[in-house]
Design a protein with these regions (language model features):
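Nucleic-acid substrate recognition interfaces
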Residues: 1-449
Length: 449
């Protein structure tokens, strides 16, 4: 379907002004504290992003419909197809919003183009066009079997009120020119055509990396969730320095991390010693109680009323509170492990398959097993920790950590592992953690004994 060849791009890693090789993808996220005028401008930018994104989807959808109805036509009689490349989308929308096309909107004063286009940064429209092109490419590749992962459907229109308000700004830089996205001090971030916005939270790490040429910002993505605006600064960073151990005493033996529903993580070493068990579920359940009350309050209102919108806004805040509670717990667990262990062994769980169990789907999703592994894997290089991923088919829970016998059946209700051969009685999560700590790539996969 694509008819244009994308322009050639430079290959190889980026070299900073200080000679640093920037090849590691990194993102820093901060909460913003914008003024009322900036909040209004943010909302306008998010709306402009929806306009550009929906514009391209509408064009492509109409073109596909017309061409599908012309299947019996000859090649010369067919309606020409549209190019789905990012550059063609950007050029077409620029011409459309500037009033250079016949399809451009007509204003009340008979002028063509979007009358409010001057209020919005150009990169908002460009990034929205790139997002639309990428979404269509994902759908096309999935349909042809050229894209790995789950099946991707045709992109959905970004409806106001349903789509999360978000937009992206590019960091335009040239040699000798100040970057358009930069920190003015420890608590303020300058964004192109928006100005200086107050940032909440510590920014020392990213500012030091920027000053030393160890990080380059590509773009800033602003998103509104639960009534708060956040910014994610995405770019490339220099490779890590040789791993430096922290001053804390590290556990030298391999540590197995068993992720579960009852406990977020149970950690034990290869000698069978329990190091730590992270519960965390109680705090999450407490936060969900407020969420349940907000959901009931929303159910009592009339859809479309002011009370409905107020209750809906309160519900969004509660959802954000639950999400932040879960995120905080996971960061506590992952940070503790990478700072106090030298080798971590985690299991390659099929989380997508586990959530298909409708009785356990919510508990498995709350435990965020995949997210915990992701955090451990990306934080491990910071502290020089080795992460070993055990085979998905290794029966860590069914294997006896005392004699190595493997049970044929072990229900989830059995919280204690009782071995029939050596009479070992041990908590099932602790037993699994010990087995993981002892796992090696040469460990045989035994179904049962």
């Amino acid at each position: 379907m694509k008819t244009e060849t994308p322009r050639s791009v430079k290959t190889g890693p980026l070299i900073s002004s200080t000679g640093q090789v920037l090849s590691r993808s990194v993102a820093f996220s901060f909460t913003l504290d914008p003024t009322l005028e900036q909040r209004i401008l943010f909302a306008k930018c998010a709306g402009a992003r929806r306009v550009a994104f929906n514009h391209h989807l509408g064009r492509v959808k109409e073109s596909l419909y017309v061409r599908s109805s012309e299947k019996a036509y000859c090649g010369a009689a067919l309606t020409p197809g549209l190019s789905w490349s990012k550059i063609s989308f950007i050029n077409e929308f620029n011409a459309w919003k500037n009033g250079q096309l016949e399809s451009s909107p007509v204003n009340d004063d008979a002028t063509r183009g979007l009358s409010w286009r001057g209020e919005i940064p150009e990169s908002v429209f460009e990034c929205a066009s790139s997002d639309a092109a990428q979404a269509l490419a994902n759908w096309d590749g999935s349909k042809k079997g050229q894209r790995a992962g789950a099946v991707v459907g045709f992109p959905r229109f970004a409806a106001k009120g349903r789509a999360t308000p978000s937009f992206r700004l590019r960091n335009r830089t040239r040699e000798g020119i100040t970057q358009s996205i930069r920190f003015t001090d420890s608590a303020h971030l300058r964004l192109p055509k928006i100005g200086v916005v107050k940032v909440l939270g510590p920014t020392r790490q990213i500012r030091r990396m920027l000053n030393r040429g160890r990080f380059h910002v590509y773009s800033a993505t602003l998103t509104q969730r639960g009534g708060r605006w956040t910014v994610a600064l995405t770019g490339v960073a220099a490779v890590f320095h040789p791993a430096q151990r922290s001053s804390n005493q590290r556990h030298q033996l391999p540590v197995g991390v068993d992720r579960g529903i009852k406990s977020l993580a149970v950690c034990a070493d290869s000698d069978g010693q329990l190091l730590v068990a992270f519960e965390g579920v109680r705090e999450l359940r407490h936060a969900e109680q407020h969420l349940i009350r907000a959901q009931k309050a929303l159910a009592r209102t009339t859809r479309g009323s002011k009370g409905y919108e107020s209750a809906r806004a309160r519900l969004k805040k509660r959802h954000r509170s639950v999400a932040l509670t879960r995120k905080h717990l996971l960061h506590q667990v992952s940070r503790y492990l990478v700072k106090r262990c030298s080798t971590l062994v985690v299991e390659d769980l099929n989380v997508a398959g586990m959530v298909r169990n409708r009785h356990l789907a919510k508990s498995i999703s709350d435990a965020a097993m995949g997210e915990l592994r992701r955090q451990i894997e990306y934080k491990a290089p910071w502290y020089g920790v080795e992460v070993v991923v055990a085979s998905r088919f290794f029966a860590s829970s069914k294997t006896c950590s005392g004699c190595g016998a493997v049970k044929s059946m072990l229900s989830l209700s059995e919280r204690l592992y009782v071995c029939e051969y050596c009479d070992l009685t041990i908590d099932r999560d602790l037993n699994a953690a010990v087995n993981l700590a002892r796992w090696t790539p040469d460990t045989p996969i035994v179904v049962s004994t």
